[in-house]
Amino acid sequence: MRRLRRLAHLVLFCPFSKGLQGRLPGLRVKYVFLVWLGVFVGSWLVYVRYSSYAELCRGHVCQAVICDQYRKGIISGSLCQDLCNLHKVEWRTCLSSVPGQQVYSGLWQGKEVTIKCGIEEGLDPKARSDLAPRQELVLFDKPTRGTSIKEFREMTLSFLKANLGDLPSLPALVGQVLLMADFNKDSRVSLAEAKSVWALLQRNEFLLLLSLQEEHASRLLGSCGDLYVTEGVPHGSWHGAALPPLLRPLLPPALHTALQQWLGPAWPWRAKIAIGLLEFVEELFHGAYGTFYMCETTLANVGYTAKYDFKMADLQQVAPEAAVRRFLQGRHCEHSADCTYGRDCRAPCDKLMRQCKGDLIQPNLAKVCELLRDYLLPGAPIELREELGRQLRTCTTLSGLASQVEAHHALVLSHLKTLLWKEISNTKYS
């Protein structure tokens, strides 16, 4: 016991000489107080972190709900057997950022995958995986029994029109949905298969995975009900994402830039990733299934493969133009800030009518170029930096209604891509 006391005394008071301790007796008390205050604050942060994790990470609840519905024959999917009966889907790290959308890294069929599943608001976050889900929850309620395949086709077409707009390409997308719905490849769509694919369509990211090219988004690998798996999480371009969520807002911009330069890819690789991001913006503007808006433009959403090809890390905040217009049109407002969809899709406010307009103020390209200024200018070759900075400044000033800047938008985007390709072409980085 005496040794323990001696050790504690050394730890707490050894930084101060005996002479100083004698001259400043109050310093001991202050030092002890600061040590215990540090212990208290540290314990509180650990508690908050654990509480936040318990709220955000509820994969066991997700799996319990899905497997309960599968065993009852309500849903189907290519993943169900491995997930619920054979237990061949391994859940690894929790990557969720909101409680309602569960995201995990995992392993399936020897591949690294990302597992995604929605949790209804009514589910108890403390529910255990061995407990049956609440019976009063209405899940997978459409289509109803007796719905013909023709009716389901029309139902799907109406849904896609409402979310993507009335486009001539939609019948082809409906055919793609019905082909996907036939999970067991028996050339017919059962009620369980129809319920499952309908539930998947309600997930914004799944709809985007169908609508956008696989080149810039993770490939869909399998599903069960409205749970689905995609290719593994791409490498992140924002190294502050590795920090705990509570500490991320505290990261100073200067430190953020320094982290990007020290830990990020070499500049030519960053240029290649940026070209992919610009091509993705081009696809959003001229896609086969209408126009899409990026409504949370951050480096946290910019990912890349092992070969430094751009991959969108998160499609949750990419929204179809029709959905954004429907949300904003006629919405009551006092200021433009009241006319915001997601984080940064903002429309003008008609102050006379006190209603939001449907067109966005800032196009995708202007928001992406703001990102690229911080991403590309640090470390850029000296002979390129001035011209690159000028073009990025021009790009960030793109304004006016998003639907009215198409020609200028295309010209600025083309100039930027050409400038970057010219720098890295005929090198190993291309």
Predicted feature descriptions by range:
Residues 2-63, 92-93, 306, 313, ...:
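Helical subdomain adjoining the active site within ATP-dependent kinase catalytic cores
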Residues 26-184, 197-206, 210-215:
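ATP-binding glycine-rich phosphate-binding loop
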Residues 99-101, 110, 204, 215, ...:
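Eukaryote-biased feature marking scaffold/signaling PDZ-domain proteins and nuclear chromatin regulators
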Residues 109-113, 119-122, 225-228, 234-236, ...:
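Conserved beta-strand elements of beta-rich interaction domains across eukaryotes
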Residues 144-201, 216-274:
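Conserved structural core of kinase catalytic domains
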Residues 207, 268-282:
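Amphipathic alpha-helical segments that line or abut small-molecule/effector binding pockets
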Residues 213, 281, 285-288, 372, ...:
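Protein kinase-like catalytic domain
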Residues 281-314, 319-320:
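Catalytic-loop of the protein kinase fold
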